[in-house]
Every structure is written in C-alpha cells, then in structure tokens.
Amino acid sequence: MKVAVLGAAGGIGQALALLLKTQLPAGSKLSLYDIAPVTPGVAVDLSHIPTAVEVKGFCGEDPTPALEGADVVLISAGVARKPGMDRSDLFNINAGIVRNLIEKVAATCPKALVGIITNPVNTTVAIAAEVLKKAGVYDKNRLFGVTTLDVIRAETFVAEAKGVDVASVKVNVIGGHSGVTILPLLSQIEGVNFSDEEVAALTKRIQNAGTEVVEAKAGGGSATLSMGQAAFRFGMSLIRGLQGEANVVECAYVDGGSEHAVFFAQPVLLGKNGVEKVLPYGEVSAFEANARDAMLDTLKGDIQLGVDFVK
C-alpha cells in the first residue's frame, strides 16, 4: 500500500504524515511531497520512528516521483486561513494549486483514491473533478472531499455538552465543508436529547469551529493538528476499504447522485473501488431539513465556481 501526501511540509501535512508513519499497515510506503525544500528532511525525521513504514520525501515543482504507484493520495497543499478570512478567500490561491496537482495525479496515478483537504473543499473538489474529466480519467467513486474534521468536532462537542463517552458518539455531518453548508444531524444521535436552543448553538459551533481555531491562534495559523487527525482517520478508512474490510463507513463530500447538489457530503460505504455505495443519511428533524434546504444555493454556487475555474 502506498500513500502520497501532497503538501506534506505544512501543518496539516506534517501532522498527517506523523500519524501515517506510526499507524499505516506494516510494509506500507509513505511518500511526502511539498514545494518547500524542507520536505526531504521531514521524511528523514519521520524515518527515525521505528515502524515498518518506508518514508520518502520529494520537493520542487513536480510531484510526479511522489505519486508513482500511489494507491491513496491525500492533498493538503495550499495556504492557510488567517483571521478575518473565510474559506472562500483561499480560493484565489488554492484553486490553482489543486488544479496543477490533480493534473499530475491524472497523468501518474489515475486509479488512486484521492482525498482533497485543501480549502475551500466545496470548490476544490469540483476543480479536481473537472481536471480529471478533461484528462479522461474521472471516476466519481475515487474522488473525495475530506469533511471528517466536521465529524470529529461534532463528536467532541456533543460528548462535552452531554457528558458522555466520546467513543460512543456517532454523528453524520452532511452538506459541504464551510459555514452554513456544514450540517450535523444531531437529531440522529442515539442516547442523547437536545433542546431546540442546544441544537441551534451546537450546530453553529460546529459550523464555526474553524474560525474558533484561527482566532485562538491569533494569526499563527488555522486548524492543523485536528485536521491532520481527521485526514488520518479518513485516509485509514480508505485503506481499510481497499484491503477488503467490510462495513467501513465515513461521511465524505462526493459526486454521489445526491438529489441536492452534484457534490454532497453524506455517509459512504468504502471498499476496493473507493465508494462502493452512497448511503442514505436517514430521517432528519424539521430544523435540519430547513438548514439543508437553506444551504443549497450556497453549496451549488461553490461547486459552480470550481467548474468555471477549469473551463
């Protein structure tokens, strides 16, 4: 199994690479790429950790050597949010970065499962899809927007609010990966009940959690460690699916034939072909149905921005 991390010298990439080095199945290969010249050094640093995972680092303009033979590609390259920015402010820089990297993926490892972490995910996934289509290698079952950070935040905040064991909390988060497009389905969580006020407050906190971190870091960055862990969880689920493990389910932002938008985050069953099945997200409350319907214009606009960027 070979996993490539593109953007490996950044805060998310380094956290993700550390977790992968310590947790990937024995015999795996971990390939790190970033434009920054420090990247081979990050690989050397990680190589001193005693696990049976081979690490190599690559830097410069061309990620091709890092991508050769990759089964899974996780892309976190791009600029981070600063205070006062929202995820859409990142579009002008990150759109071009994702386009260029996906062109190389299309040429080098078109069958790889690709997880896009680079924000704004609502738009960058659409960019990736259009680039892959142009190259004639698009497979909607192999492209994912990684929304797992919304899921782990929801799990954490619910457990804190209700004083329950976080391991017992399972939350589906649907829609997209910014602001109002993030919709945790709190009504479905077993064993806990919320007042209307609690639902409204928790939903807003989950939607704005990224800003909470950006402001707390006071200009020093955005969510890197929690995003690294979320990307690791999702990446490992992709690998478990590839290895034939049954019943591997994660929420992800996919081109899954949703009635709501071309790309929509919802639970997916993962397997040897990436998405084996898009799963229904179940019954929702009136609050959730209203929030879902209210987000769709924003989500569709984000997607169209990506389509137009490539055209």
From Swiss-Prot:
Disulfide bonds: none annotated. The active site is at H177. It comes from the Bacteria. The keyword Aminoacyl-tRNA synthetase does not apply. GO terms for cellular component: cytoplasm. GO terms for biological process: malate metabolic process; tricarboxylic acid cycle. It is an enzyme of class 1 (oxidoreductase). Substrate binds at R81, R87, N119, R153. SUPFAM superfamilies: LDH C-terminal domain-like (SSF56327), NAD(P)-binding Rossmann-fold domains (SSF51735). PROSITE patterns: MDH. InterPro entries: L-lactate/malate_DH (IPR001557), Lactate/malate_DH_C (IPR022383), Lactate/malate_DH_N (IPR001236), Lactate_DH/Glyco_Ohase_4_C (IPR015955), Malate_DH_AS (IPR001252), Malate_DH_type1 (IPR010097), Malate_DH_type1_bac (IPR023958), NAD(P)-bd_dom_sf (IPR036291). Keywords: NAD, Oxidoreductase, Tricarboxylic acid cycle. GO terms for molecular function: L-malate dehydrogenase (NAD+) activity. NAD(+) binds at G7, A8, A9, G10, G11, I12, G13, D34, N94, I117, T118, N119, M227. Its EC number is 1.1.1.37. It catalyses: (S)-malate + NAD(+) = oxaloacetate + NADH + H(+). Belongs to the LDH/MDH superfamily. MDH type 1 family. Catalyzes the reversible oxidation of malate to oxaloacetate. PANTHER family: MALATE AND LACTATE DEHYDROGENASE (PTHR11540), MALATE DEHYDROGENASE, MITOCHONDRIAL (PTHR11540:SF16). Homodimer. This is Malate dehydrogenase. The gene is mdh.
